[in-house]
Amino acid sequence: MSNKTKLKDNKELLYQVVLSYKVSHNYPLKAFLIECKNKLNECIDMIWNNIKYTKKDNPKLPKSNEFKRELRNKLLENWNYASHYIDGIIKTSYSILQSWASNYKRGYRTKTKPIAKRLFVRVKTTLIKYDKEKGEIRITIKPRKDYLILNIKNEWFFDKVKNLTIGEIILKEKETFLTFKDNLNYSDKGMIVGVDSNLRSLDLFHPIEGWTRVDLTELHRIKEVYDRKIDFLKKLLKKFPLRAMRKINRLFERRRNRVKDFLHKLTIQLSRLFPDAIFVFEDLNKRRMYKSKYFNRKIDRVNWNGLIEKISYKTIVILVNPAYTSTICPICGSRMESQEGQVVYCSNCLNSFNRQLVGCYNIFKRGLGNIKEIMGGSGVTTTGVEVSFGKLMTPNPNVIYIVDYNGKYFNEIA
C-alpha cells in the first residue's frame, strides 16, 4: 500500500497516520459493556495489588509473562463473550495504571486506585472483518452467535478510507469510533519545517522560505468572547441555577466546536502551505507553565496539543525537547541573554536576534538531527542547514498569514 524504505540494517522506516471516525449504531450493547467495565475494574484491582514500590517510592507494575497469563485466565472465568476482549481489557488496564504511575512520579497523583466509570471496550483487529467492496464492518461479540454489523459505504468519509487498513475500534453504547491506518514514508518528504508554538502565533522556519508566521489572534478572540459570556453567567448561578447552567453548557459546547473548526482549517492550510514537509514541534507541557491567574487564562486559550494532534492526521510530525530553544545562539551555540522586547543577545559572538526566529530555527535544527539519526543520514533534503547569516538577522517575519475560513489556503497580510 505504501512505499517502504529500507535502511542499512534492513528496517522499514514508516510513519503511520491514524484516521478516526465516529459512526452511530442502535445495537443493544449496554449489558455487554457493563460486564466489560466490571472486568476492567477487576483487572485494575489485580494489577494494583501487585504493584511494588522502589526505595524512592516509584511504582513498578507487574509485567512478567507468568503474571499476565494468570491475570488473563482469572478474567476469563465466567466470561461469555469473545476471549479477545479480555486482551483489550488488560491492555486498557495497563494503559490507565501506567498513566497514573507516570503522574504519581511527578507529584500530580496520590496513591489512590483509578476506577473505570465509562462504558466502552477496545475491539482488537482479530474480532473485526472489513469488506472493502461492500463497505461492511463485522464485529464479533460472541463467536458464531452474536455480531455487530456496520455499513459505512454511505458515510461521508468512505472514499478516504476504502483502501486503508482498519485498526482498533472503540465500542460504546450508541456509537463506535473506527480507526484506519495509512503509512507515510519519511523519504517521500523533501523538507523540514521548524514550528515555534507561541501564545498568539506559530513561527515557522523553512530552509528556503525563511521565517514565516501564522497569526493565531482569531483563536484567542473566539475563546475570550466565550469566556466572558461564561464568566457573566457564573455570577447568576445562585439566582437561576438551572437556566444559567443550561446556558453555560451550551456556550462551552459552542466554544469547543468553534475551536475545533478553527484548528481543522489551520492544520489543513498549514499542510498545504508546505505539502512536502516534515513538521517539527516542541513537546510542550502546560502544567509547568502555570503562574498567576491572568497568565493561566492565557495559557488555557492556546491549544498546542490539539494542533499537533490534528496536523499529525495530515502529515509527518516530530516532537523535540523544548528546553532553551529560544536562548541558544544559532551561530555559535552559546546561551544568550534577553534584552528589551523580543530581542536576545549573544555575548560570545556579539550578535542580536529575534527570539521567535531563534526558537523556530533551533527547533528546525533539532528536528533535522533527529531525522538524520533515524534515517542514518539519508533520505531527507538537508537544504538550509547552513543558513545564510542574513536570514538569521531579519527582525521581522518574511510573510505573515491568517486562516481563511472560506478558502483552501492562508490569507497573506504582510
Swiss-Prot record:
Question: Do you know which InterPro entries this protein is assigned to?
Answer: Cas12f1-like_TNB, Transposase
A molecular function GO annotation: DNA binding
What is the taxonomic lineage of the source species?
A: Archaea, Methanobacteriati, Methanobacteriota, Methanomada group, Methanococci
Q: What is this protein called?
A: TnpB-like protein MJ1635
GO annotation terms (biological process)? DNA recombination; transposition
**One Pfam family recorded for the sequence:** Cas12f1-like_TNB
Q: Provide the alphabetized UniProt keywords.
A: DNA recombination, DNA-binding, Metal-binding, Transposable element, Transposition, Zinc
In the record, the note on similarity to other proteins reads: In the N-terminal section; belongs to the transposase 2 family. In the C-terminal section; belongs to the transposase 35 family.
Domain of life of the source: Archaea
Q: Does the keyword DNA-binding apply?
A: yes
Summarize where Zn(2+) binds, as residue positions.
C329, C332, C346, C349
